[in-house]
Amino acid sequence: GRVSLRQAHIALGIFLVAYILSFIDRQILSLMVEPIKQDLGLSDLQVGLLQGLAFAILYAVVGIPVGMLADRISRRRIIAVGVLFWSASTALCGFAGSYAHLFMARMGVGLGEASLSPSAHSWLSDAYPPAQLSRAMAIYNLGITIGGLALLVGGAVVDMVAQSGAIVLPVFGPMPTWRAAFLLVALPGALVAALVFIAREPARRARSKAGMPLRAALSHLRDHKRTFIAIYANSTLLSIMGYGLTAWYPTLLIRGFALTPGQASLRLGLIYLLLGSMGSLAGGFAAERLTLKGVRDANLRVVMIIALLCLFPALLAPLMPSPALLLVLFGLLTLFFNGYFGCSLAAIQLATPPNMRATGAALFLLANSLVGLSLGTAIVPLIDSALFGGHGQIGSALATVGLCATLLAAVAAWSGLRSYAQTIESVAQR
C-alpha cells in the first residue's frame, strides 16, 4: 500500500547509507595498489583493469535488466541480496590468491552494486509525491559526492590495519594488511542489508504511458545523431578522466610523496566531499540561469565550458613538485569537473521524448560506466607504458589523459551546440 512521508524518509536514509557503502567497497582498492602489486606480482595496467574493467563489466551491463526486474518483483529483496553479494565479493577480494581470483571477485562487487540504483530509483518514485521526488533523488545522489568519505574511511582502515601488523584469523592464519582491510570494509554490508528490510516497500504507481517502442527510440536517436554523439562523446571523455583521477591520484600521492594511504585519503576525500559538492551545485545553477535567460543549449554549453576550465588544472596538477601545489590544483579541478554529470543527464532528458527518457538515461549511464570506468582506470598505466617507458610515471600519464580528454570533450560539445538546440525545440513541440 501507500507509505507515509516518514516511512519514505527512512527508506531514503537507508539507501543513501547503502550508496555510500558501495563507494567505499568500490574504491578502497585504489588505496592499496602498492601492497597488492607486491603480494600478487602485478603491473600498474593489471591493477587498472581490476579497478575499472573487472568492476564495470557486470555493473554497466546488468543495470538495465535489473531495472526491468525491479518493476516486477520485490525491490527490497533485490537490494538486500545485492548488498550482501557485493559485500561478500569484497571480502573475497581479501582471500584472492591470484590475479584471476581477484578479477572475478571485483566482477562480483560490480554485479552486486548494479542492483542498488535501479531498484532505489523505482522505490523512491513510488514512495514520494511527484512534487517531492526531485529533492529525494538529489539527496540520494549525494552518495556520489559523499563517496569522498570512501577515501576517508578506507584510508583510515588501511592505516589502522597497517599499524596493527598482520592479522591472524582462525583457519586462515596470518593475513597481510591489504587482505584484512577488504574484510573490514565488507563487514557493514550485513547490517545495511538487514536495515533494508526495516523499510516498508510502497505500492507501485500505475504507469500512464507505455514506453516508446525500440524501433521508434532508435529512429529518434538516428534522426538527431549529431546531438547525441556530442552529448555521449563529451560525457564519456570526461568520465574517462574522472575515473582515472579517482583510481590513480591516491597512488600518485603515496608513490610520489611518500604519504600513507590514510594521509592521502584524508586530503583527497575532503576535496571530493567539499569542493565536489560545490561544483555539482554550481554546474546545475549555471545551466539553470542560462536557461532562464533563453539559452536553449544551456546544459551542453555549460559542459563545454566545464571541459575548458578543467584543461589547465588537469594538465598541471599531477606534475607539481609538492603535494601542497598538487592538491590546490586538484581542488580546482574537482570544483570545475563535478558540475558536468548533472548537466549531461539534464541534456539527455531534454533531448529525448518523455516516453524514452529512461532509455536515454540508461544508455548514458552504460557509456559512462562501461567505457569511462573501464578505459579511465586502464588508460593511465597504458600511456605510462607506451609513452614514458613503463617506469611508473603516473603523474605524466595523468597529465596526458587530462589534456587530451578535456580538449576532445570541449570540441565534442561545441560540435553539437546548434543541433542540440534544434533537437530540444523539436522535442518540446511534440
Stretches found by the model and what they are:
Residues 61-97:
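Conserved MFS/SLC helix-loop-helix module at the cytosolic interface between two early adjacent transmembrane helices
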Residues 105-143:
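Cytoplasmic helix-loop-helix junction between adjacent transmembrane helices
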Residues 137-159, 272-280, 365-377:
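Glycine-rich segments within core transmembrane alpha-helices of 12-TM secondary carriers
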Residues 1-4, 201-231, 256:
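Juxtamembrane intracellular "pre-TM" segments in multi-pass secondary transporters
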Residues 41, 74, 95-101, 129, ...:
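Helix-breaking motifs and short loop linkers at transmembrane-helix boundaries and internal kinks
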Residues 29-30, 226-280, 341, 345, ...:
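Extracytoplasmic gate region of multi-pass secondary transporters
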Residues 32-61:
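Extracellular/periplasmic helix-loop-helix junction of adjacent transmembrane segments
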Residues 140-197:
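Helix-loop-helix hairpin linking two adjacent transmembrane segments in secondary transporters
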